[in-house]
């Protein structure tokens, strides 16, 4: 398996990815990952570009910026905050579910899946797309950030208005990449370490309802936040 095979991503991302891997930074990153694999390192996720496979640039309406993948077995799937159905829901994602319930009256799901969001135009993009087993941030500052920054710029340069959700200081460091005609929502990271603390607690931020109000004002379709998976029925919520 070629972990860096991006042939499955949506066509409107492919030129940016090809340009990156043709660059010196991209070649260094590819060499680093191959060297680590050859040394026996266990690297997650198996499909680093999954977010770009599920959400086309042209269909992106909301961007949720993550930092790097989960580093436990079977967790990371190439989508920020998402875990597959068989995995225990991580604490940050539990707080996302908690805020959805508080904000929109959405019942907390039994799954940590977010593919239903991705297929509606929510780009779940981590800044770093690979990690080694048990070693958080082990592939940070190896080159991924140059690619994902370029993707964020590409999204921001698109003429269609978008919502950027920047949770925590790291995600907020990406704000200079974003243009003024988009809605930027900022608060603390949903981690239990910061979700209820100043300056802007995640619990109580109201980002999900605020995003939908703004999208509707722009003449765009709202996100059905209760649709966590492809098969999930749409629930009624408190947003009118």
Show where each model-derived region lies.
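Acidic, low-complexity intrinsically disordered tails
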Residues: 233-240
